[in-house]
Amino acid sequence: MKITILGSGGGEGYPAAFCGCDHCNAARAAGGKSIRTLSQTLINGDLLIDFPCDTRVHALNSGVNLGDVANLLITHTHSDHFAPEELSCRGGCFAHNIKEPTLTIRGSSDVKRFFDTVFSVYNLSGKVAEGILFDEFAAYESCRVGNYTVTALPARHAQGLIPYNYVITDGEKTLLYLLDTGYPTEEVLAFIRENVAHADAVIMDATMGVAPVGAYYGHMGFEENKILKEYLITSGVADASTVFVADHITHNKAETHDKIEEIFDGTGILVAYDGMVLEI
């Protein structure tokens, strides 16, 4: 399984567009891996996770033709993860010779309502609308998504909404995708223990950076990443071969990429960056 982290930043990106804090100024000066666009991940070139307004930039930077993608998973409706109006260019006079004529979007009932609301105001042209389907599924439900079996996990994030994390397997390799979320609930951890034989990769929310454990219910920080890694190994879900990645990084609680790597040095946790490729 090839995992490409197209965007590794939190909700405002890093540096944030309007921000003059020391961290953002340092990131502008450092460039490279310290520049983080909005969160998005691509699996094997055919399964996309989330669809922020930075999607076109991600396609350009990675050399990906999004017309080759048949399936899209949405974690939740916050704008840094789902900007459905960007789909208006998928077809008609805007896109030709699309390899995959139909894009199937999957997410919670909350995501479906948001999708319908946006396009009740921002109409899709007939040709574009014909090529976009939505398949709603419930928490803990598993469904076949192209070459994968995907299971939705309730995320600790966005009170009043229905956010998901995902277990994604191709039958040989399994990814635990834990963005955006606080430390998983015992119910979710129990489900993972009972249903995930082995996680080959775990991508973890690290939004809270150096903040103390439990600083915010809806995001994890670096210490919680370390705790979760040890928990998954102790519970038998992960082992020394599992790739752990801290992702969804913001300027409020984390410095430049090299400084974050220093924090995780010796822990076996990698720090995500835009364009990062994992082969598991």
Indicate where each model-derived feature is located.
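Short, charged/polar "capping" segments at the starts of alpha-helices
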Residues: 111-116, 252-257, 279
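Histidine-centered divalent metal-coordination motifs
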Residues: 71, 75-81, 157, 219, ...
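Alpha-helix termini
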Residues: 63-64, 90-99, 121-127, 230-240
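Active-site metal-binding motif and surrounding structural segment of the metallo-beta-lactamase
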Residues: 46, 52-104, 200-202
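Core dinuclear metal-dependent hydrolase active-site scaffold
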Residues: 1-64, 134-194, 277-280
